[in-house]
Protein backbone atom coordinates (compact mmCIF):
# COMPACT_ATOMS: atom_id res chain seq x y z
CA UNK A 1 0.00 0.00 0.00
CA UNK A 2 2.98 2.33 0.41
CA UNK A 3 3.58 2.21 -3.34
CA UNK A 4 -0.03 3.26 -3.99
CA UNK A 5 0.29 6.23 -1.64
CA UNK A 6 3.64 7.27 -3.12
CA UNK A 7 2.50 7.10 -6.76
CA UNK A 8 -0.78 8.92 -6.04
CA UNK A 9 1.02 11.66 -4.09
CA UNK A 10 3.23 12.20 -7.16
CA UNK A 11 0.15 12.52 -9.36
CA UNK A 12 -1.52 14.92 -6.92
CA UNK A 13 1.58 17.18 -6.83
CA UNK A 14 1.43 17.84 -10.58
CA UNK A 15 0.22 21.33 -11.55
CA UNK A 16 -3.03 19.79 -12.83
CA UNK A 17 -3.35 17.43 -9.82
CA UNK A 18 -4.76 13.96 -10.37
CA UNK A 19 -6.79 15.25 -13.32
CA UNK A 20 -8.69 11.95 -13.51
CA UNK A 21 -5.57 9.77 -13.29
CA UNK A 22 -4.79 7.38 -10.44
CA UNK A 23 -2.36 4.61 -9.64
CA UNK A 24 -4.40 1.61 -8.48
CA UNK A 25 -4.13 -2.01 -7.50
CA UNK A 26 -6.50 -4.26 -9.44
CA UNK A 27 -7.84 -7.31 -7.62
CA UNK A 28 -10.46 -9.86 -8.58
CA UNK A 29 -13.86 -10.95 -7.32
CA UNK A 30 -16.18 -13.49 -8.85
CA UNK A 31 -19.42 -15.41 -8.44
CA UNK A 32 -18.60 -18.91 -7.13
CA UNK A 33 -20.63 -21.85 -8.46
CA UNK A 34 -22.05 -24.32 -5.96
CA UNK A 35 -21.17 -27.20 -8.31
CA UNK A 36 -17.45 -26.78 -7.55
CA UNK A 37 -17.72 -27.20 -3.77
CA UNK A 38 -17.40 -30.97 -3.36
CA UNK A 39 -15.72 -33.26 -0.84
CA UNK A 40 -13.81 -34.82 -3.77
CA UNK A 41 -12.15 -31.45 -4.49
CA UNK A 42 -11.20 -31.00 -0.81
CA UNK A 43 -13.96 -28.62 0.28
CA UNK A 44 -16.07 -28.81 3.41
CA UNK A 45 -19.25 -29.72 1.53
CA UNK A 46 -21.24 -30.48 4.69
CA UNK A 47 -24.83 -29.37 3.96
CA UNK A 48 -25.79 -26.41 6.17
CA UNK A 49 -28.55 -23.82 6.17
CA UNK A 50 -28.47 -20.18 7.25
CA UNK A 51 -31.07 -17.50 8.03
CA UNK A 52 -32.89 -16.47 4.86
CA UNK A 53 -32.43 -19.80 3.06
CA UNK A 54 -35.75 -21.23 4.32
CA UNK A 55 -34.21 -24.51 5.46
CA UNK A 56 -32.50 -25.26 2.14
CA UNK A 57 -28.98 -26.59 2.58
CA UNK A 58 -25.78 -25.78 0.71
CA UNK A 59 -22.12 -26.82 1.10
CA UNK A 60 -20.55 -25.02 4.08
CA UNK A 61 -17.55 -23.72 2.07
CA UNK A 62 -19.87 -22.50 -0.69
CA UNK A 63 -21.76 -20.32 1.81
CA UNK A 64 -18.43 -19.05 3.18
CA UNK A 65 -17.49 -18.00 -0.35
CA UNK A 66 -20.87 -16.35 -0.93
CA UNK A 67 -20.33 -14.37 2.29
CA UNK A 68 -16.97 -13.11 0.98
CA UNK A 69 -17.86 -12.59 -2.69
CA UNK A 70 -21.44 -11.35 -2.21
CA UNK A 71 -23.21 -13.81 -4.53
CA UNK A 72 -23.05 -17.47 -5.55
CA UNK A 73 -24.66 -19.50 -8.35
CA UNK A 74 -26.75 -22.43 -7.08
CA UNK A 75 -27.29 -25.75 -8.86
CA UNK A 76 -31.07 -25.87 -8.30
CA UNK A 77 -32.95 -22.56 -8.75
CA UNK A 78 -35.41 -21.48 -6.04
CA UNK A 79 -38.57 -19.85 -7.42
CA UNK A 80 -36.69 -19.12 -10.65
CA UNK A 81 -33.77 -17.51 -8.82
CA UNK A 82 -30.37 -19.00 -9.64
CA UNK A 83 -28.25 -17.13 -7.09
CA UNK A 84 -27.76 -16.74 -3.36
CA UNK A 85 -26.69 -13.33 -2.07
CA UNK A 86 -25.20 -12.42 1.28
CA UNK A 87 -27.32 -9.76 3.00
CA UNK A 88 -24.97 -9.09 5.91
CA UNK A 89 -25.45 -9.97 9.56
CA UNK A 90 -25.24 -13.71 8.82
CA UNK A 91 -28.33 -13.61 6.60
CA UNK A 92 -28.68 -14.81 3.01
CA UNK A 93 -31.37 -14.54 0.34
CA UNK A 94 -32.13 -15.67 -3.20
CA UNK A 95 -31.54 -13.46 -6.23
CA UNK A 96 -32.09 -13.45 -9.98
CA UNK A 97 -28.66 -11.98 -10.83
CA UNK A 98 -25.43 -10.95 -9.12
CA UNK A 99 -25.73 -7.21 -8.61
CA UNK A 100 -24.11 -4.24 -6.93
CA UNK A 101 -25.52 -0.88 -5.95
CA UNK A 102 -25.18 0.19 -9.59
CA UNK A 103 -27.16 -2.69 -11.11
CA UNK A 104 -26.55 -6.18 -12.50
CA UNK A 105 -22.85 -7.08 -12.61
CA UNK A 106 -21.33 -7.53 -16.07
CA UNK A 107 -18.47 -10.03 -16.48
CA UNK A 108 -15.11 -8.37 -17.09
CA UNK A 109 -16.62 -4.85 -17.04
CA UNK A 110 -18.11 -4.22 -13.59
CA UNK A 111 -15.81 -3.26 -10.74
CA UNK A 112 -16.01 -2.34 -7.07
CA UNK A 113 -14.21 0.41 -5.17
CA UNK A 114 -14.15 1.73 -1.63
CA UNK A 115 -16.83 4.28 -0.83
CA UNK A 116 -15.80 7.89 -0.32
CA UNK A 117 -13.07 8.23 -2.96
CA UNK A 118 -13.45 11.44 -4.92
CA UNK A 119 -12.65 10.19 -8.43
CA UNK A 120 -13.13 6.45 -8.08
CA UNK A 121 -16.84 6.58 -7.24
CA UNK A 122 -19.88 4.50 -8.24
CA UNK A 123 -20.73 5.16 -11.87
CA UNK A 124 -17.19 6.13 -12.91
CA UNK A 125 -15.90 4.44 -16.05
CA UNK A 126 -12.16 3.88 -15.92
CA UNK A 127 -9.50 2.52 -18.23
CA UNK A 128 -6.58 0.61 -16.75
CA UNK A 129 -3.15 0.36 -18.31
CA UNK A 130 -1.89 -3.08 -17.32
CA UNK A 131 -0.89 -5.92 -19.65
CA UNK A 132 -1.59 -8.37 -16.80
CA UNK A 133 -5.14 -7.12 -16.23
CA UNK A 134 -5.75 -7.14 -20.00
CA UNK A 135 -4.48 -10.73 -20.26
CA UNK A 136 -6.49 -12.09 -17.29
CA UNK A 137 -9.77 -10.29 -17.96
CA UNK A 138 -9.56 -9.58 -21.69
CA UNK A 139 -10.55 -6.03 -20.79
CA UNK A 140 -9.08 -2.74 -19.65
CA UNK A 141 -12.33 -0.77 -19.30
CA UNK A 142 -14.34 -0.91 -16.05
CA UNK A 143 -17.44 0.69 -14.59
CA UNK A 144 -17.54 1.05 -10.82
CA UNK A 145 -20.92 -0.46 -9.93
CA UNK A 146 -20.27 -1.94 -6.53
CA UNK A 147 -18.57 -1.40 -3.19
CA UNK A 148 -16.94 -3.79 -0.79
CA UNK A 149 -16.44 -3.60 2.94
CA UNK A 150 -12.89 -4.90 2.78
CA UNK A 151 -11.68 -2.71 -0.08
CA UNK A 152 -8.91 -0.19 0.42
CA UNK A 153 -8.18 3.21 -1.03
CA UNK A 154 -7.01 3.01 -4.67
CA UNK A 155 -8.12 -0.62 -4.99
CA UNK A 156 -10.27 -1.61 -7.97
CA UNK A 157 -11.90 -5.02 -7.50
CA UNK A 158 -12.60 -6.25 -11.04
CA UNK A 159 -15.52 -8.62 -11.59
CA UNK A 160 -14.44 -11.82 -13.35
CA UNK A 161 -17.83 -13.52 -13.70
CA UNK A 162 -19.01 -17.00 -12.66
CA UNK A 163 -16.71 -19.97 -12.12
CA UNK A 164 -16.01 -22.86 -9.82
CA UNK A 165 -13.37 -22.07 -7.18
CA UNK A 166 -9.67 -22.69 -7.86
CA UNK A 167 -9.41 -24.88 -4.76
CA UNK A 168 -10.13 -25.11 -1.03
CA UNK A 169 -8.82 -22.78 1.68
CA UNK A 170 -7.32 -19.52 0.44
CA UNK A 171 -7.93 -20.60 -3.17
CA UNK A 172 -11.73 -20.60 -2.87
CA UNK A 173 -11.61 -16.82 -3.26
CA UNK A 174 -10.29 -17.25 -6.80
CA UNK A 175 -11.97 -18.67 -9.91
CA UNK A 176 -10.70 -21.92 -11.37
CA UNK A 177 -9.75 -20.18 -14.63
CA UNK A 178 -6.90 -18.09 -13.18
CA UNK A 179 -4.32 -17.81 -10.40
CA UNK A 180 -4.37 -13.99 -10.65
CA UNK A 181 -4.06 -12.17 -7.32
CA UNK A 182 -3.40 -8.52 -8.13
CA UNK A 183 -1.69 -6.13 -10.52
CA UNK A 184 -0.74 -2.46 -10.31
CA UNK A 185 -2.09 -0.20 -13.04
CA UNK A 186 -2.43 3.39 -14.09
CA UNK A 187 -6.13 4.21 -14.28
CA UNK A 188 -7.81 7.06 -16.09
CA UNK A 189 -11.40 8.17 -15.52
CA UNK A 190 -13.23 8.40 -18.84
CA UNK A 191 -16.52 10.07 -17.80
Labelled PLM ranges:
Residues 6-191:
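Solvent-exposed, well-ordered loop and adjacent helix/strand elements within mature globular domains
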Amino acid sequence: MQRLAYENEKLARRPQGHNGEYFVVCTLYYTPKESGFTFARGFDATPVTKPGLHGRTYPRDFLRSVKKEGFGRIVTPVNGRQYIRYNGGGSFGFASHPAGGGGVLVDRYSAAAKLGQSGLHRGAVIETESPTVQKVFGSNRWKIMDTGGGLRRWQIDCYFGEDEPLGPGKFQGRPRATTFEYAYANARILN
